[in-house]
């Protein structure tokens, strides 16, 4: 595309932005007005993509990390020929619109990730670039680069102030993710005013210290943008391209001020902006007519690029049928199929033996990775304690790209966002691991995964007061309830080693949201199951009967995780007809319906046993009928902490007998 055409495209982006935000009476005009030239360069020339096929695998990915500037993206997608109509633009920020206030994955063709919470977009972009590097090492040959694309992101000062951006950028530099190119819209303005108030550091030096290539130019020089992007592509380091800009450019009433950030220009402001831009104030949603032919030509060129790749892919498939078979296995819907999982042999766990569910998880993960090479992930500096140091998962590094294990370092938030990016990219099934109590560090990324309904997996060990000596800073009590409170999240808390295998199967077959696998530090026994069909029951219903309690149980204990063993001991001690139910997944159990719940519960009175707060169990039992923990723990051996808190089998017996008196 010529510079003249890109100028016309930038003008059209500004026009659509002004009118869409004014019509909605809501939005953020500052960034789209200030960065329209960049969008014109990207979508007019730089990006390797195909608007007619937004899911083409080898496309470049663009992530608008500064998601509040969504009209920049929607306007560019509309002009480029994506299935985003002018009517969609006119319905910006309206209920049911394909152009919501912030970009939403799955809502708008061409939107690669849900963004808006600042810093997470660049972090997911790191995940995209990491996935590209892994897959390129696995599938490319000297003659066939079937995985060869770049990830671009646009950030502002707000993104770079967020800690998660620092975490992810540090990781990207360490791993030398050279296919990652980040544009920094440097306008020195945030909502509160000049960034002199809040952001005095030298960003360029900071990113150089991370191991990035740093380049500088003007947002309003097409030559700068094109040349700097070409320079970035030649370097094997991630690149930060700092583009000096003016927020709200072209709108005289707000240009260069914080007033441009997050409010419509108003009738007078719109009129003045259109005059300044050389537009007719009476004309709304203007698109330069000369763009029609230019953009149609560009769209045809993009389709031809995909056609050329398809030819390359078919030649590669013919020459390397084993690699093609691995490719097909990696790209099944959801990343893992039932038939693939059927080939995984469950490790042998001796009945009556005792081991921590985190240890069992490590054995299961090793078995899974030996069959599923696209299962990848890592830990936030807890590889051993999280039991994810499995022999079948080789480390990934700047020097060794074919590995599948990521040393994320002490960067929980970035880890989760990077896992989300890897999951969005496709071709991999990704997990991240840490102590359960530190899931609070990455909760916003878990929430975005839930909002996007992507099946990121999070392995959370050290799940209760039985952590012991590390004390209450490391003993989660409120965390189970907090995780379960997020819509679309599955929380799986297995009671023993065999349930841990089932938990991983459920997690990997789940496709409509993230999964948290919650695991114990302490040993728990592998117990006999009273129902031979317990595996299918727990997969379908999230819970199953561990102890029948006779033909007509007097009372049922609902328990999860390590408290299932506690409940079994209490049932035995009570000498009453007590049924024990293991609730592996409370969300599935509660969604199973009244009939299934009654069958599993047995129609008896209910007591709950769980080493966490009462919140979330109110529909099943009153607080006084539950053995729960509504207080923090203490430092000491786990069993002694439990005794001190009266969280014991004997305490549960007392509740049971009182309830049956």
UniProtKB/Swiss-Prot annotation:
It catalyses: D-sedoheptulose 7-phosphate + D-glyceraldehyde 3-phosphate = aldehydo-D-ribose 5-phosphate + D-xylulose 5-phosphate. The keyword rRNA-binding does not apply. Substrate binds at residues 28, 261, 358, 462, 470, 521. It comes from Treponema pallidum (strain Nichols). GO terms for molecular function: metal ion binding; transketolase activity. The lineage of its organism: Bacteria, Pseudomonadati, Spirochaetota, Spirochaetia, Spirochaetales. Catalyzes the transfer of a two-carbon ketol group from a ketose donor to an aldose acceptor, via a covalent intermediate with the cofactor thiamine pyrophosphate. The active site is at 412 (proton donor). Pfam families: Transket_pyr, Transketolase_C_1, Transketolase_N. The record marks 28, 261 as: Important for catalytic activity. This is Transketolase.
């Amino acid at each position: 595309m010529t510079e003249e055409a890109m100028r016309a495209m930038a003008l059209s982006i500004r026009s659509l932005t002004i009118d869409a935000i004014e019509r909605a009476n809501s939005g953020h005009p500052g960034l789209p007005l200030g960065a329209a030239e960049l969008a014109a360069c990207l979508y007019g020339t730089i990006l390797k993509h195909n608007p007619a096929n937004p899911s083409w695998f080898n496309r470049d990915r663009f992530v608008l990390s500064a998601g509040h500037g969504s009209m920049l993206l929607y306007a560019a997608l509309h002009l480029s020929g994506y299935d985003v109509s002018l009517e969609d633009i006119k319905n910006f920020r309206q209920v049911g619109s394909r152009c919501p206030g912030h970009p939403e994955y799955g809502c708008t063709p061409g939107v690669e990730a849900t963004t808006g919470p600042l810093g997470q977009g660049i972090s997911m972009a790191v995940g995209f670039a990491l996935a590209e590097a892994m897959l390129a090492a696995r599938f490319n040959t000297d003659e066939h680069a079937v995985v060869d694309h770049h990830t671009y992101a646009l950030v502002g000062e707000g993104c770079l102030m967020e800690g998660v951006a620092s975490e992810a950028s540090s990781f990207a530099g360490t791993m030398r993710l050279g296919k990652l190119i980040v544009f920094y819209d440097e306008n020195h303005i945030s909502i509160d005013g000049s960034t002199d108030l809040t952001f005095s550091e030298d960003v360029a030096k900071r990113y150089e210290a991370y191991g990035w290539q740093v380049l500088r130019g003007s947002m309003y020089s097409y030559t700068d943008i094109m040349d700097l992007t070409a320079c970035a592509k030649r370097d094997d380091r991630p690149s930060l391209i700092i583009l000096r800009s003016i927020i709200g450019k072209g709108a005289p009433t707000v240009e260069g001020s914080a007033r441009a950030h997050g409010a419509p220009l108003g009738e007078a402001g719109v009129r003045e902006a259109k005059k300044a831009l050389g537009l007719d104030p009476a004309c709304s949603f203007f698109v330069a007519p000369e763009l029609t032919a230019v953009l149609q030509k560009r769209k045809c060129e993009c389709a031809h690029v995909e056609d050329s790749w398809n030819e390359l892919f078919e030649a590669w498939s013919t020459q390397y049928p084993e690699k093609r078979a691995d490719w097909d296995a990696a790209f099944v819907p959801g990343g893992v199929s039932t038939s693939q999982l059927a080939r995984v042999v469950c490790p042998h766990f001796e009945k009556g033996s005792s081991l921590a569910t985190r240890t069992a998880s490590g054995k299961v993960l090793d078995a899974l990775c030996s069959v599923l090479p696209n299962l990848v992930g890592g830990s936030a500096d807890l590889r051993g304690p999280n039991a994810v140091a499995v022999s079948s998962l080789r480390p990934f590094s700047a020097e060794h790209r074919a590995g599948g294990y990521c040393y994320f370092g002490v960067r929980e938030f970035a880890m989760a966002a990077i896992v989300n990016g890897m999951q969005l990219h496709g071709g991999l099934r990704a997990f991240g691991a840490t102590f359960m109590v530190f899931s609070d560090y990455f909760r916003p990324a878990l929430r975005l995964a839930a909002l996007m309904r992507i099946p990121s997996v999070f392995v959370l060990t050290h799940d209760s007061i039985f952590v012991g000596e590390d004390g209450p800073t490391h003993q989660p009590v409120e965390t189970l309830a907090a995780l379960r409170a997020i819509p679309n999240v599955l929380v799986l808390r297995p009671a023993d080693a065999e349930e841990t295998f089932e938990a991983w199967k459920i997690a990997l077959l789940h496709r409509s949201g993230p999964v948290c696998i919650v695991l114990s530090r302490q040993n728990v026994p592998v117990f006999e199951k009273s129902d031979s069909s317990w595996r299918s029951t727990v997969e379908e219903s999230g819970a199953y009967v561990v102890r029948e309690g006779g033909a007509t149980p007097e009372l049922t204990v609902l328990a999860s995780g390590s408290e299932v063993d506690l409940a079994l001991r209490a049932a035995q001690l009570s000498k009453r007809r007590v049924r024990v139910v293991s609730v592996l997944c409370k969300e599935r159990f509660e969604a199973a319906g009244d009939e299934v719940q009654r069958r599993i519960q047995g129609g008896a009175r209910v007591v709950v046993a769980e080493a966490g707060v009462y919140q979330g169990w109110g529909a099943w039992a009153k607080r006084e009928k539950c053995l729960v923990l509504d207080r923090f723990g203490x430092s000491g051996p786990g069993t002694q902490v439990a005794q001190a808190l009266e969280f014991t089998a004997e305490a549960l017996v007392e509740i049971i007998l009182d309830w049956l008196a």
